[in-house]
Amino acid sequence: MAALGGNRDVAGNQNSLEIDSLARFAVEEHNKKQNALLEFGRVVSAQQQVVSGTLYTITLEAKDGGQKKVYEAKVWEKPWLNFKELQEFKHVGDAPA
């Protein structure tokens, strides 16, 4: 059992339209902020933490110049305010071949 306010895995995250949408949002926002051209591939895993909304930590694959890489994105969402913000986006490694 996760501690109150702690991170917990999102069940069925690879098939979740919501998580997929948040991951795509993260890549789009990163591309805008960094003038990058990453292309979303797939969600690898996702966790969520309740913090005046929900903070999602999403591990995803994206192509950078045709090469698959793994990134970690943190997206803060408050659906009742129609608020969504990319908090962090970082490269964590190369995707397995």
Curated annotation (Swiss-Prot):
The record marks 5 as: Reactive site. The keyword Cell inner membrane does not apply. Keywords: Protease inhibitor, Thiol protease inhibitor. It holds the Pfam family SQAPI. InterPro entries: Cystatin (IPR027214), Cystatin_dom (IPR000010), Cystatin_sf (IPR046350), Prot_inh_cystat_CS (IPR018073). One of its GO terms (molecular function) is cysteine-type endopeptidase inhibitor activity. A motif (Secondary area of contact) lies at residues 49-53. PANTHER family: CYSTATIN FAMILY MEMBER, MULTICYSTATIN. Belongs to the cystatin family. Phytocystatin subfamily. This is Cysteine proteinase inhibitor.
